Amino acid sequence: MKFFKKLAPAVALALCFGIGGCGDTSFSVKLGYNDGTLPNEDGTLFYREYDESLFYRNDLTLKKVADPSVIYVEEGEYAGKLFLYGTSNTLSVRGIGVWQSDDGVHWDSYGVAFEPETASWGYSSLWAPEVIYDGAGKYYMTYSARNSNTIAAGGKYYGNTYIGLAVSDSPAGPFVQWTGTNADGAEIGLGDPIFDPAKITAVDGVACEAGHYARYRFLDSSLFADGDELYMYFSRGKDRYNVLTPGADYAYGKETSEIWGVKMKDFSTPDYSTVTRLTKVGYNTVDGETEADYNDIDRERASADQINEAPQMYKRDGVYYLTYSVGGTTSNFYSVAQALGSSPLGPFTKLSKADGGLVLGTEMNWIQAAGTGHHSFTPIGDELFIFHHEGADRYTIDSENRAIAYDRAGMAENSKGQKVLAANGPTSYSLQPLPAAISGYKNIAPEAEVSVSGLKEGSDKKWLTDGFFASHLTGVVGETEFDAGTTAEISLRWKEYRTVGALLLYNSIDYDKTFYRIARISLSVRTASGATGTAVADNAAFPFDETTNYSSQQLMFAGSNLVLDFNDIEVNGITITFRAPRSEGSVAVGDICVLGK
């Protein structure tokens, strides 16, 4: 961790902790803080130093890695550590790499987690690993690989892409390919993938033909434990150069990939009788045939490749959330979407963008993120996060140019009353709070009583402390709007004093509704000696330079915020006062985060 000076050099901390003259029961002093806007020593504005004990920033430091699977280890030798597994260009996709991190930003390579033996069926093109812990000391990795080995299994699977299984006693690896007798009594050797593709395709009556350019591909697998039951999800893709007569579901000359699922008898044995198709590209359901069942996210983000891929399952309060990536893998609009169901194998119904279907994605003219897809939902303590890859240069994306980022996620409610997954991002240059399990500080704003003045008619103060900020103009996350030309005030009050170390005030995603500065932020504080009073920050300016796409002037960067980072203070109230500068319209606040204990 870098040493970071929390107090801006131009402002002295004057909260009178143990300083003479603070015996008064009431006082008002200037709050000393760092807002992260001081230039670096070389004068540059981006990637400035910051307090790494409280915040993180997606600096995209882990490059040439894609398709991340991330787990947070809660016990044992690596308790409190994050492990990431991914498709690795540096390994020439002949092995799966593993990296370890304390904060999700700074990653140390632990080398090769898994490299198949030369006799293995899956000897090349190792992609998209997913790791799950069984709770009993074993870590299981599923992965995709292409069988370029003509010797393995007599060349039975040569040229095709299938799913393999590896196992380890440690999250750091090494993983070894699983071999042995599965639950059906079949002997699985190095030359066999854990699924027999002939049995998988036979379920819907379509035979899998051999040959490099005439095949179905099985990839992007993930395991999901639902109580004592285990399920496997995967993408079944039809190659863009497929010479088979395309069916009605597929566009000739284009790659199509859709989500399928199967119940597992154990980690190595699929129950082939349960293989189920879960999505249909372009439609809300697998039975969709008419325009009325079009899915706007699939169609809005379609490219030359028409895909639903990289599935993950999440369950909350009896609802199953099938999340997956849409758009082409090299498209700037590669995004994460969701469908809802009442059982692990569906049926599932995709959500529209207005109903929260877009979990994570970019918009037209964004210059700070591209291709934010192939995700991993990772619980860290009591919070949920979404890891994903994106273009390493932030403008474009291709198979040689990807990096890892992450953002907060959680449950929001759409206008139909459905609880849906939502993500705070994709964020780029702005600071975000570290996971509470890592920093020891959580967002206590939702625990405060909130009052406001200057609220625009029809707006709602609930968006101020719901834990979400809007990343798109359309979606399930709203903003609190205030009348233009007025002085607005937001007040947060706690029933008792809380230890507070930082305040983040999120701006509107809509360029036309942004605030430029905050006239006053006043904290009701208590000193160590018991004196009470206020600590005040005046004219705190919002950092427009690294949060705005000036060329389009339509959308702000997702997660743009004003940050006040200060030494811990005992606080029981915060009042935020600002003047909406415009003569018409409104000014919006996306969210308020107070990092405290």
Report the location of each language-model feature.
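Extracellular beta-strand-rich recognition modules
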Residues: 234, 388, 574-578
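C-terminal motif of bacterial Sec signal peptides marking the signal peptidase cleavage site
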Residues: 18-21
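Juxtadomain low-complexity/linker regions and immediately adjacent membrane-anchoring helices
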Residues: 412, 418-475, 509-522, 577-597
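Bacterial N-terminal signal peptides that target proteins for export
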Residues: 1-8
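Beta-rich carbohydrate-recognition and catalytic domains
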Residues: 25-126, 133-219, 224-303, 315-320, ...
